[in-house]
Amino acid sequence: MLVSSRKNIDRARNFRKALGGGMRQAGIIAASGLIALEEMTGRLHQDHENAKLLACALGKMPQVELDPAMVQTNIVIFRLRGNGDAQALVNAVAARGVRAGTVGPLSVRLVTHHDVDRAACERAAAIIVESIEELF
């Protein structure tokens, strides 16, 4: 129970929702996590290899700050140098069918998973490289 001003209660409610406190169907999300742990671990190395493929392609670019050796999972986060704009890049690649996210104004996050095969990662790498060259 929280007793406070209206402002603090509203703020606490926002924090609760941000942390998942408003979820009513948490079991559905938990079920997908269990499936991932029980059935998908055998192919996890493919996701990691695909992430490494993306990292190697991007790590060669002078506009990108990324050490491919640091990519150990299926997540690739890279930083744009100079006049880079992460949101502009995310928008540009989205228009060409590649989903990415921003992590601040200069950093972009890519995630590989079982629905993204090697050929798709190769296409995504080419699209991201071309977009960076066009934008920056």
Segments the model singles out, each with a brief description of its role:
Residues 58-64, 92-99:
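Short amphipathic beta-strand starts and helix->beta connectors
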Residues 88, 106-136:
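PLP-dependent enzyme catalytic core of the Aspartate aminotransferase-like
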Residues 1-81:
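Active-site C-terminal subdomain of aminotransferase-like
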Residues 20-21, 94-101, 128-136:
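A common structural junction motif
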Residues 7, 49, 53-56, 88, ...:
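Alpha-helical scaffolding segments of alpha/beta enzyme cores, especially the outer helices
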Residues 84:
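Basic, amphipathic alpha-helical recognition segments used for DNA target recognition
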Residues 43, 87-89:
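Extended hydrophobic-aromatic, low-complexity segments
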Residues 69-71, 75, 97-112:
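Conserved PLP cofactor-binding pocket of PLP-dependent enzymes
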